[in-house]
Regions:
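Conserved phosphate/anionic-ligand binding catalytic regions in large, soluble enzymes, centered on
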Residues: 269-282, 286-287, 331-335, 425, ...
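A conserved hydrophobic secondary-structure block that centers on an alpha-helix together
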Residues: 129-150, 164, 168
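Short glycine-centered, acidic/aromatic-flanked micro-motifs in structured strand/loop junctions
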Residues: 140, 170-172, 211-213, 389, ...
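Conserved PLP-enzyme active-site core in the AAT-like
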Residues: 13, 118, 148-307, 369-373, ...
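General small-molecule cofactor/ligand-binding pocket signal
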Residues: 139, 192-196, 377, 410, ...
Length: 950
């Protein structure tokens, strides 16, 4: 034997892909080799002129060791910077059983409610926390970050308000990053932002106003009077409130506000260099149909049992397109679940103890400084003590002394320093900080602490009284509660999830491990640059890899979702055109097949959408494109194009599409939703795209988290790079530094980037090329097998599809009355999550198997759909009544088949329709959910007590 052959750097690719299936899959397609297959599937006109320029693969162990070396270059100081980001403790029972558990992190957004009741309940808990702490009756299931939530509040205030004004007031005490994002949004909405003293907010005419509660420098102001004065004018008032402070302070609703928003990071979500974190968004009941983002609501199932679902979806971009309330798809479900479970585990007394401890430590520190003669700026505060030293020299000295002791403070200005206390602060920290501020070694602090919050500011009402927050305070009980919820959800640790345009591939364990390393999770986004060398090396590595893959000249990591990536890409185009005297260009061409985020994003940037027809094959109609590009050539801004198309086909005319738009003065934005069919085969920049967004949570293995987090970085050509998002606080050392931001943190959800780094490093050049080929191979195998029973709606060259295929159910529906929804629900009885339903074509299923599914799993899925076809035929032939058959009654629960049975089909046909199902059985916890009832009777708070008695 040869020693060199016993070391296999490509071992991970063999775990990610099923190499042993290659011959059988190719044979089924009538192909002799993988190269022949790719040649017969991908148009030669789009192929890359050179090989993929990535390093060779490393083993799992070597990749982890290399990443550990990079991570170790980050310095973990004790962070007292604040500004919306604070050290926190993730209870280990939540860390291990939610954040590190594939049963939670590999699930998709809960579109199929019957197999998502666990995380729906967890998100309902999160909403209840937000409802209790803000005092409003309705809260959403998270937004991307606090700054985005503030921008959404501004837009919502304009939608629902009655004041005839285009001006919005912003409290000068809001976080700088929040104001930065609001400036970006306000410009293209045509709003004027007026920043000023909170107490003078009522001196102008504003459609809306935003106040910070607690202020960025730590002060807590009584906002009740100024809010009252604004309300008499009809102004819609939003309050950005620190979630931990609301445990003690009066709620925003009690202050008289209309909307409350903020970050829930303090409830057990690590700082992670800025994200991901779940923002909260709560509001008055009358605004619920104008609110952004997901809302979980209580409905009932077919048996009348309470059941949860995503409510009021008609507000959203996939339905309302350019008229949507927001371009947001999904936000931060996994992080919202962490925050909600933090409240479940600690309960009302636990969170009060934590909030009081934070406040007591800050108050004790302030008292000691005052007794030592120092000037504490604010007399009323929650957690942040700001001291004015009167000179820059003294400020520098204190800042340096703290740094030398391992503490990061915030320099407010030349004479002021702030220290923000938090959940992990200790009495030992008090001594160290006192020494840094005074130069004295120690002080004696009393056990009895007089807080710095005035009595009239304190909350009088009870919080977290629901049984869910008062039942699981021992670890055993919490563990079992989490397991009970997990068992109600079908995630990728049970079976493949073939959602088209979603790329539900393997999220390997080795990829996930580093996100909980303290070197990544415990870094404040505004930590001194000398302490973040590891992150900067990680970002540089990632930028080089993504540039090599896509062909672009620059990468921006700031967008913290795919929708934000779209917005950032189109924003860069708008800024570029304005800088070149072409700000009048306001027409955006969008193909008829596009995802709803595309027109919603265009509308948010003040663009008018012109729809381009598609032909009978699903491709962009080149003649119609040419006619419209020429018609609008003087005002054409851009085209938004997805590639391969949303119909799952490589359009041979993509170079012509780009050329036509460029010839008529426009730019090409490429939607990267389908990038999984491009890597190593083509480069979007090379075929003519000017900017592309990439979904790291699709193509590059960041898990979907049951509805977030995601990352949507953009690749840009050199001419657009100076117009990518910048940041007001963080020096990004790039050409776009002076631009305003799209997200709160400069690098978005930076702490989940190690997942993608690990994927790229373990796959290497060869593995990444193979992954794309396997994605195509699996999709075409599924399409070929299913074409024996169902029409495949669109195909390209040689009858091939790209990485996904669309199964047309309309002929079956016309003959049998069985709908695409019936088939989607019936798949649950076979143990599978449905593919994408009725997108991009109504009455269809769009299937994307990804590269990481084995032939055995594909065959089970195919067998399920083939058997369902036979079931539909039984209905068609009259063997089963149209109103009583396994399809219209799906899904079937354990309660169904153990109770009375009067159906014309057997219990076995209901729940074990094929032999493999017995070994792979997943039991939905509710019957089909009544969508209409849930919207007509909206309840988005926790269920009554009796529902928790099991």
């Amino acid at each position: 034997m040869k020693l060199s052959e016993l070391f296999n750097p490509n071992e991970f690719a063999a775990r990610h892909l099923s190499f042993g299936d290659e011959a059988a899959l190719l044979e089924a397609l009538g192909e002799k080799s993988m190269d022949d297959f790719v040649g017969n599937t991908v148009p030669q006109s789009i192929r890359m002129p050179s090989e993929l320029n990535l390093p060779e693969a490393l083993t799992e162990a070597d990749a982890l060791a290399k990443l550990k070396g990079i991570a170790s270059k980050n310095v973990i100081n004790k962070s007292y910077i604040g500004l919306g980001y604070y050290p926190t403790r993730v209870p280990n029972v939540i860390l291990r059983n939610v954040l590190e558990n594939p049963g939670w992190y590999t699930a998709y957004t809960p579109y199929q409610a019957e197999i998502a009741q666990g995380r729906l309940e967890a998100l309902l808990n999160f909403q209840q926390v937000c409802i209790d702490l803000t005092g409003f009756p309705v809260a959403g299931a998270s937004l991307l970050d606090e700054a985005t939530a503030a921008a959404e509040a501004m837009a919502m205030a304009h939608r629902v308000g009655k004041v005839k004004s285009e001006s919005f007031f912003v409290d000068a005490r809001v976080y700088s990053q929040t104001l930065d994002v609001m400036k970006t949004r306000a410009k293209y909405f045509g709003f004027e932002l007026v920043v000023g003293d909170f107490a003078q907010a009522d001196e102008g005419e504003y459609f809306g106003a935003l106040f910070q509660y607690v202020g960025k420098d730590g002060d807590v102001q009584d906002l009740q009077d100024v809010i009252g004065r604004l309300k008499t004018k009809g102004t819609i008032v939003a309050v950005a409130a620190d979630i931990m402070s609301l445990v003690l302070l009066k709620s925003p609703a009690e202050l008289g506000a209309d909307i409350a928003l903020g970050n829930t990071q303090r409830f057990s979500v690590p700082m992670g260099f800025g994200g991901p974190h779940a923002a909260y968004f709560a509001f008055k009941d009358e605004f619920k149909r104008s609110a952004p983002g997901r809302i979980i609501g209580v409905s009932k199932d077919a048996s009348g049992k309470p059941a949860l679902r995503m409510a009021l979806s008609t507000r959203e971009q996939h339905i309302r397109r350019e008229k949507a309330t927001s371009n947001i798809c999904t936000a931060q479900a996994l992080l919202a679940n962490l925050a909600g479970m933090y409240a479940v585990y600690h309960g009302p007394e636990g969170v009060k103890r934590i909030a009081n401890r934070i406040h007591a430590l800050a108050s004790t520190f302030a008292d000691a400084l005052v007794s030592d003669g120092l000037n504490v700026v604010h007399k009323v505060f929650f957690d942040t003590v700001t001291v004015d030293f009167g000179s820059k020299e003294k400020t520098d000295q204190v800042f340096a002394a703290a740094l030398e002791s391992g503490y990061n403070l915030r320099r407010v200005n030349d004479t002021q320093v702030a220290a923000a206390f938090h959940e992990t602060s200790t009495r030992e920290d008090l001594v160290d900080l006192y020494r840094a501020f005074t130069g004295k070694d120690a002080f004696a602090f009393a056990d009895d602490v007089k807080g710095r919050l005035n009595a009239e500011l304190l909350r009088q009402d009870d919080i977290l009284q629901h049984p869910v927050f008062n039942s699981y305070h021992t670890e055993h009980e919490m563990l079992r509660y989490l397991k009970k919820l997990e068992d109600r959800d079908l995630a990728m640790n049970h079976s493949m999830i073939s959602l088209g345009s979603c790329t539900m591939k393997l999220n390997a364990t080795a990829e996930m491990l580093p996100i909980t390393w303290a070197e990544f999770s415990d870094i404040h986004p505004y930590a001194p640059e000398a302490q973040t060398a590891g992150y900067r090396e990680l970002l540089a590595d990632m930028e080089n890899s993504l540039k090599a893959i896509t062909g672009f000249d620059a990468i921006s990591f700031q967008p913290n979702s795919g929708a934000q990536g779209e917005y950032s890409g189109m924003l860069s185009i708008r800024r570029y055109q304005e800088a070149n005297g072409e700000g009048h260009r306001n027409i955006c061409l969008i193909p008829k097949s596009a995802h709803g985020t595309n027109p919603a994003t265009a509308a948010m940037l003040g663009l008018k959408v012109v729809v381009v027809d598609t032909d009978e094959h699903g491709n962009v109609n080149i003649d119609d494109l040419k006619a419209k590009a020429e018609q609008y050539r003087d005002v054409l801004s851009a085209i938004m194009i997805t590639y391969p198309s949303t119909h799952g086909v490589y359009e041979e005319g993509i170079r012509d599409i780009c050329r036509i738009v460029h010839e008529n003065g426009g730019q090409v934005y490429m939607d990267g939703a389908n990038l999984n069919a491009q890597i190593g085969i083509m480069q979007p920049a090379e075929v003519g795209a000017d900017v592309l967004h990439m979904n790291l949570h699709k193509t590059f293995c960041i898990p979907h988290g049951g509805g977030g987090p995601g990352m949507g970085p953009i690749g840009l050509k050199a001419h657009l790079a100076p117009f990518a998002p910048g940041h007001v606080v963080t020096d990004m050392h790039n050409a776009s530094a002076d631009q305003t931001a799209v997200a709160a943190a400069a690098y978005g959800s930076a702490s989940i980037l190690p997942i993608t780094w690990m994927y790229l490093t373990m796959m290497g050049k060869q593995g990444m090329e193979q992954a794309t080929r396997w994605a195509l191979l699996n999709a075409n195998y599924v399409a070929k097998r299913l074409s024996e029973d169902y029409p495949i709606l669109y195909t390209g060259k040689n009858g091939r599809v790209a990485h996904e295929c669309i199964v047309d159910l309309r002929p079956l529906k016309a003959e049998s009355g069985i709908t695409e929804t019936d088939i989607a629900k019936r798949l649950m009885d076979y143990g599978f999550h449905a593919p994408t339903v009725s997108f991009p074509v109504a009455g269809t299923l769009m299937i994307e198997p990804t590269e990481s599914e084995s032939k055995a799993e594909l065959d089970r899925f195919i067998a399920a759909l083939k058997q369902i076809k036979q079931e539909v035929l039984k209905v068609e032939r009259g063997e089963w009544p149209k109103e009583d058959n396994p399809l219209v009654n799906a899904p079937h629960t354990a309660s169904d088949v153990t109770g009375e049975w009067a159906h014309p089909y057997s219990r076995e046909e209901a729940v074990f329709p094929l032999p493999f199902v017995r070994e792979h059985k997943f039991w939905p916890s509710v019957k089909r959910v009544d969508e209409v009832y849930g919207d007509r009777n909206l309840v988005c708070s926790c269920l009554p007590t009796e529902n928790y008695e099991d």
